[in-house]
């Protein structure tokens, strides 16, 4: 019932001509347009782990051994012999071309056929194969392989699907990306935080009533199941809602973001306020961001020129025009208006997450002994 009501509500907002007129000026601003050739991956190195994969490949890339390994597995394929786990793992690390990957895929099919009812243990071959496709730029082969009925169950992990979707997004193969998402749900693979972000990014890029409906449906489904929707996913949903002339939904999505202090969130907030006509609030946000006493090493809030141009246009001829122009001039002088587009802010490759360095085992033991002695001393006192 909820999804049915959502479908009806979506059709209403998309066909409401009077509401669309309110946003016409904002859409003409060319906001959210991706610059030509600006293709981005959305997953961080922590997820893709390409560097780690390449380091492991280096230990296997010895030409005289590579040919030998491929000869062995080809002979096993011809004789219908069982492929061992170690052989498949070594083979995947030995692939250097598209032709090698095709052979590896055939070996995977044989391996999966022999081990369909056997658990692979902790090691997952799916992400390894997808990282190989990622490295060699074989996104279409990756998509075809992960949807192959003969390999159902082999790619049982979320990471394999996420890496595939990320590759397809980078090559602007958005419809193929949605097909992979459909296969993911069909196989019962759970959607992770990264999956929601990737799917909403694809829906945002497609910007159609169908993609908007998919975004709304998955968002409702995720919230109903108690999934954690990441901030970046909400930002893509907000951008798509604005492109679909749905200010009400954009505001609702924004209200779900717990921490809105990022540059992207602040730009989206000003954009929403400008389209809404809330000039007083928009000016307050910009005025608050204009902090001349900010230390040199602290990065000042920046706003996209696309966003401030929408604000200028919306305030033109009104009582707030002069005040808007005044605060924008001050921001311009402070270097807080940037040429970076909203699409650039949305579609970026995140940096690797910082991890605290772990102490060696010996140091940890010393710290534990020190802590115990301190506790004993306190008890004696």
Swiss-Prot record:
UniProt-recorded name of the protein: Pentatricopeptide repeat-containing protein 2, mitochondrial
Ranges occupied by PPR repeats: 157-191
A UniProt-annotated Pfam family: MRP-S27
PROSITE patterns xref list: PPR
Alphabetized UniProt keyword annotations: Mitochondrion, mRNA processing
Signal peptide start-end: none
Functional note: Involved in mitochondrial RNA maturation and mitochondrial respiratory chain function.
Location in or out of the cell: Mitochondrion
Top-rank lineage group of the source organism: Eukaryota
Intrachain disulfide bonds: none
Main location: mitochondrion
Cellular component terms per the entry's GO annotation: mitochondrion
GO terms of biological process kind: mitochondrion organization; mRNA processing; regulation of mRNA processing
InterPro entries recorded: mS27/PTCD2 (IPR034913), Pentatricopeptide_rpt (IPR002885), PTCD2 (IPR034629), TPR-like_helical_dom_sf (IPR011990)
Membership in a protein family: Belongs to the PTCD2 family.
């Amino acid at each position: 019932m909820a999804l049915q009501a959502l479908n009806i509500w979506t059709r209403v907002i998309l066909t409401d001509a009077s509401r669309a007129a309110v946003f016409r000026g904002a859409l003409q601003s060319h906001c959210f347009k991706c610059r030509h050739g600006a293709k981005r991956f959305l997953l961080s190195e922590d997820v893709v782990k390409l560097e780690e994969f390449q380091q492991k490949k280096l230990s296997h890339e010895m030409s005289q051994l590579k040919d030998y390994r491929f000869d062995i597995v080809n002979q096993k394929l011809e004789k219908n012999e069982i492929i061992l786990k170690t052989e498949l793992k070594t083979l995947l690390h030995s692939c250097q071309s598209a032709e090698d990957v095709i052979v590896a895929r055939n070996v995977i099919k044989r391996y999966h056929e022999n081990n369909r009812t056997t658990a692979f243990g902790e090691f997952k071959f799916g992400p390894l194969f997808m990282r190989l496709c990622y490295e060699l730029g074989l996104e279409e082969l990756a998509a075809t392989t992960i949807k192959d009925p003969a390999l159902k169950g082999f790619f049982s992990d979320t990471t394999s699907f996420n890496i595939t979707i990320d590759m397809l997004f980078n090559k602007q193969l958005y419809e193929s990306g949605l097909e992979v998402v459909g296969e993911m749900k069909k196989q019962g693979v759970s959607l992770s935080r990264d999956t929601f972000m990737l799917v909403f990014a694809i829906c945002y890029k497609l910007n159609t009533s169908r993609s908007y409906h998919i975004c709304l449906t998955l968002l409702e489904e995720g919230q109903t199941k108690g999934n954690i929707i990441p901030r970046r996913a909400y930002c893509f949903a907000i951008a798509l809602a604005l492109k679909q002339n749905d200010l009400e939904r954009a505001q609702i999505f924004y209200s779900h973001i717990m921490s809105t202090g990022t540059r992207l969130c602040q730009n989206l907030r000003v954009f929403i306020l400008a389209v809404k006509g809330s000039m007083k609030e928009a000016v307050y946000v910009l005025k608050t961001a204009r902090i001349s006493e900010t230390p040199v090493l602290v990065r000042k809030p920046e706003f996209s020129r696309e966003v401030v141009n929408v604000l200028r246009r919306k305030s033109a001829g009104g009582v707030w025009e002069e005040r808007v122009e005044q605060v924008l001039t001050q921001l311009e002088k402070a270097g807080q208006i940037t040429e970076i587009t909203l699409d650039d802010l949305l579609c970026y490759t995140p940096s690797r997450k910082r991890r605290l360095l772990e102490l060696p085992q010996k140091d940890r033991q010393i710290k534990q002994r020190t802590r115990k002695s301190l506790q004993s001393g306190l008890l004696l006192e």
